[in-house]
Amino acid sequence: MVAFSALSGVSALSLLLCLVQHAHGVSLKVSTQGGNSSSPILYGFMFEDINHSGDGGIYGQLLQNPGLQGTTPNLTAWAAVGDATIAIDGDSPLTSAIPSTIKLDVADDATGAVGLTNEGYWGIPVDGSEFQSSFWIKGDYSGDITVRLVGNYTGTEYGSATITHTSTADNFTQASVKFPTTKAPDGNVLYELTVDGSVAAGSSLNFGYLTLFGETYKSRENGLKPQLANVLADMKGSFLRFPGGNNLEGNSAENRWKWNETIGDLWDRPGREGTWTYYNTDGLGLHEYFYWCEDLGLVPVLGVWDGFALESGGNTPITGDALTPYIDDVLNELEYILGDTSTTYGAWRAANGQEEPWNLTMVEIGNEDMLGGGCESYAERFTAFYDAIHAAYPDLILIASTSEADCLPESMPEGSWVDYHDYSTPDGLVGQFNYFDNLYRSVPYFIGEYSRWEIDWPNMKGSVSEAVFMIGFERNSDVVKMAAYAPLLQLVNSTQWTPDLIGYTQSPDDIFLSTSYYVQEMFSRNRGDTIKEVTSDSDFGPLYWVASSAGDSYYVKLANYGSETQDLTVSIPGTSTGKLTVLADNDPDAYNSDTQTLVTPSESTVQASNGTFTFSLPAWAVAVLAAN
């Protein structure tokens, strides 16, 4: 057992003294001997469905409200085509999970195309790849069914397919089509499904759980949008924490993220009211998260519900014997993930298409239990979940959802980790620079969420402050094992939290990378396995640094949190050449957004003289020197 207590960061006074230093030449000497080990999975991703980052974001399904899910189903995103009307039909369920379908009533004298359209999530990105659509239909009909992608305002057709299908009024039957597309100039595209009005005249047809997918990342069925997945792949992150976040907690025990309702066929997933103002289809479910990890080479970090909902919602926290069914539910989930096919839940996983167990090594118990009334009971709840999980799976790393000592057991179990979150102002993040210098080295840290807060878009001042914070924890990456910026993704048409790392609209190529994205990319792509000692003639502030090595390669990361240029000499014995990547702007408020890209990194080759590199770092800058 390991004792644990709270620690404080640097004082405001010391921060002020750092910030008022004048620019002058700074000399850094990197030792090529010794050093501390650095976590090989330091940089990664935290994901939850916020800002339509899942549905309408990285998840490849392009139709909004595809199954009319929810306790109060509606026709959001749907409209009728031709001489027909549509309505919600609760008397013709597709499955027990999808109790409502769309009823299409066709006029007695209808001719031409009649049917329904879907507007997607503020549009549909048509990228020129092969598309596929599926749907369930019930009703007496035998004839052509056409699926089209058509400009909302222009009427331009970007792809279509027609099939002949026969359905009856007795049962739903499924149909699917594949068709080539031409790239649309923007996201103003509608999905249109129509039947022959003259054949269907005077009748009613029901449609259930419709899907539309373009190309997916690595051609994964029910997979990710490649445009966004590629941007994440470019960062070379090491882990993915899922499914949240607040969206794991829900607003009550009943409303929590339920793993067993996110698996199997899409039409067997009821979805849930998410905690970020919109309904989640759960098409991006447990299997899809693990395939995301598999396809991007990420270590999965699974969050499990621990008896506490947001702001103590739904009479939570749950304690004592009342926790037992929720602990059992987590054990069932872990058997589903890790069990072989001789187990009940391992066999269920195999029946759902995944024969081999997944490689899960880390589980986080709850989310931010220090907030909203969760702290007082968390030590009890954490211990109950820890004891049960550890007994069944002793090799799993179990992570507490907070690092606040008042919320944790007096003695943390050997091998457990804690999770530290920090949303702050730029000065606040810089003020935490040496917080990690003072940690007890026996309790590993996961920095599960951090970023500069309360601004629309990441700007240079905020991104440099994040770099200072990152330099602080990378210097201590023997004990800080993982860290993730949050939130990760943002559909600009529906945003609940800013700033975010990556923004997008539904135009096919409309992805904009923030200044903070570039900082994350620069730091993640340039990693050593050993943190090196650096000696200097200057104190930290406004210039901050960390150095690491991997074999004969050295990486020096720098942040200039100030308005004056810094002249540097960086000595690394034995090196002769390097690549210098710099992200900088004299305007601390400069930012990238959906309307402008003002700041991008620049790269240059630099030569050393007797192992010493000489260069200047502009105001409000982040840089990485990769030398060998």
UniProtKB/Swiss-Prot annotation:
Chemical reaction(s) catalysed: Hydrolysis of terminal non-reducing alpha-L-arabinofuranoside residues in alpha-L-arabinosides
Subcellular location: Secreted
Top class in the EC scheme: hydrolase
Glycosylation sites: N36, N51, N74, N152, N171, N260, N359, N493
Pfam families: Alpha-L-AF_C, ASD1_dom
Keywords: Carbohydrate metabolism, Glycoprotein, Glycosidase, Hydrolase, Polysaccharide degradation, Secreted, Signal
GO terms for biological process, alphabetical: arabinan catabolic process; arabinose metabolic process; L-arabinose metabolic process
EC number: 3.2.1.55
Pathway: Glycan metabolism; L-arabinan degradation
Single GO cellular component term: extracellular region
Signal peptide: 1-25
Keyword Glycoprotein: yes
GO MF terms, alphabetically ordered: alpha-L-arabinofuranosidase activity
Biological role: Alpha-L-arabinofuranosidase involved in the degradation of arabinoxylan, a major component of plant hemicellulose. Acts only on small linear 1,5-alpha-linked L-arabinofuranosyl oligosaccharides.
Family: Belongs to the glycosyl hydrolase 51 family.
Protein name per UniProt: Probable alpha-L-arabinofuranosidase A
Organism the protein comes from: Aspergillus awamori (Black koji mold)
Phylogenetic placement of the source organism: Eukaryota, Fungi, Dikarya, Ascomycota, Pezizomycotina
Gene encoding the protein: abfA
